[in-house]
Amino acid sequence: MASTSFFPPRPSSTLAEIASLTKATLVDASYAEHRITGLASLDEAGPMHLSFFENLRYSDELANTRAGACLVSERFEGRVPSHVAVLRARRPFHAFVAYARHLYSDALRPHTGIGAPGIAPTAVIHETAKLEDEVTVEPLAVIGPDVEIGSGTVIGAGAVIAAGVKIGRDCDIGAGSHLQHALIGNNVLMHPGCHIGQDGFGFIFAGQHTKVPQTGRVIIQHDVELGAGTTIDRGSLRDTVIGEGTKIDNQVQIGHNVTIGRHCVIAAKCGLAGSLTLGDNVALGAMVGINNHVMIGDGAQVAAMSGVKDSIPAGERWGGIFARPTRTWFREMLAVRRLAEGSGAETAARPDDDRDEGRG
């Protein structure tokens, strides 16, 4: 359940209010004034908690729950114990999240809670930097020359915003992050330790490996979220671009000249080599590695821990090392398993050889 010490909730709500906010139906109106003070999973919930159910895997937890109310679809409504108020919703988890966003709005942004709104006395801000009203700069952050920061943006403790960087409105730049050679849109969230705009990995690999100047930028469009420890290299000649609405998990490495489309989802520890392109709505599972100059089409999906060396057409699902269409991958894995099982059966049928003869 949510920790109220870290995430103080709003005042409690009645089930009638929750039904209105989530567009759910309160099945028994006699529960309309029952108050909910927090959220919890079915197995941890008490009489003042709201929970949800939409997966039969958790049937035992539902049967034994002490929750005060449960969001559930009409299909599973009859499984809810009689002492639990039923909120009927077409998509229970979506309704649960809608109320969670209302109750714990502070949890939606990577605030550290260090310092008060405004400019901390220990922050260092260059005289040529331009900050709109209602910008917060936390302790020990450094803002360089000619930086521009939009209203409502928070620069976390110890962050460094290098010369010429432009940051839009209502952004959160996590503690310890470092931004250079970058243009950042509105409502961009960066969790702690992001590094944006450093050199791309560009060398002439011969003899002493001659470094290639990296003179491009990083452009991050509106509504992008970057997980902790994510790094995005600036382009060499053209820009590295992260498209609007894309969500990137922790510890992802994005190489120089990469173009990522809109509303992509990239899970933790992916590595994207230079000059590749992701279309819109692409999904990458955790620890996917993609070769340089590859094109991943709109809506394509890549399974976790895959290695991609070839371009993937739009809308296809690929996986494996090296990645290929998932149906092909599954057939190959099944064939290998059958081959291994057959080989194991033959080995087990052979008489013991004499390699261990004489050992005690």
Swiss-Prot record:
Residue spans of biased composition, Basic and acidic residues class: 349-360
Active site, UniProt feature: 256
Metabolic or biological pathway, per its Swiss-Prot or TrEMBL entry: Bacterial outer membrane biogenesis; LPS lipid A biosynthesis
Gene Ontology cellular component annotations, sorted alphabetically: membrane
Record keyword Acyltransferase present: yes
Gene3D superfamilies in UniProt: Hexapeptide repeat proteins (2.160.10.10), MurE/MurF, N-terminal domain (3.40.1390.10)
Disulfide bonds: none
A Pfam family matched in the record: LpxD
Subunit structure, as described in the record: Homotrimer.
NCBIfam families xref list: lipid_A_lpxD, PRK00892.1
UniProt-recorded name of the protein: UDP-3-O-acylglucosamine N-acyltransferase
UniProt gene name: lpxD
